């Protein structure tokens, strides 16, 4: 399907070219294709200040958890942004819920943000609330420059809390490009009544 669409597009463009050539002389050479949509097309995107943050998948994920974790206070959002591809996505899955006396029924939904939007929407929360997240197990798949990690994580309000306030899965889609690793997207969902973590997600698997 992709191939046939490509041929249709080429035929369409060829028709335009033949049409134009019948009316005027050949145009001057066009400018090089735009770099928008590539890493080179985002020169202002924060670079990783510490190459050790992004040189391995383990370091990439450890850095993400390190950046968002800590007592109430400012987070290093440039360090956070630098872990992601420009215009990468962070998606929170919102479960469906029945109506209660305090709120109406809610449909299941997905809230998707860019790294910039995530920082803007959560900055005030982190400034006034402690938040500590750590990975307890990873399931890793890899092919070529594509890596997928299901990271089982725990969240605590204070570092020394015995029990986590929540647990869930962070699903990372990661790519290797320009000599380093990047998060292309991050989706997450949490345990709740009726949805608990299976035992297989509480131990490491894969690479």
Locations of the language-model features?
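Short, well-ordered alpha-helical segments enriched in acidic and aromatic residues
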Residues: 73-100
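Hydrophobic pocket/interface hotspot
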Residues: 64, 80, 88, 149, ...
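N-terminal secretory signal peptides that target proteins for export/translocation
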Residues: 1-5
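Short beta-strand edge/turn micro-motifs at domain boundaries
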Residues: 31-38, 148-150, 167-198
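Surface-exposed, charged secondary-structure patches
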Residues: 24-26, 102-161
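A mature extracytoplasmic/lumenal domain signature
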Residues: 94-96, 151-155, 187
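Short, low-complexity N-terminal intrinsically disordered segments enriched in polar/charged residues
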Residues: 23-83, 203-206
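Bacterial N-terminal signal peptides
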Residues: 6-19
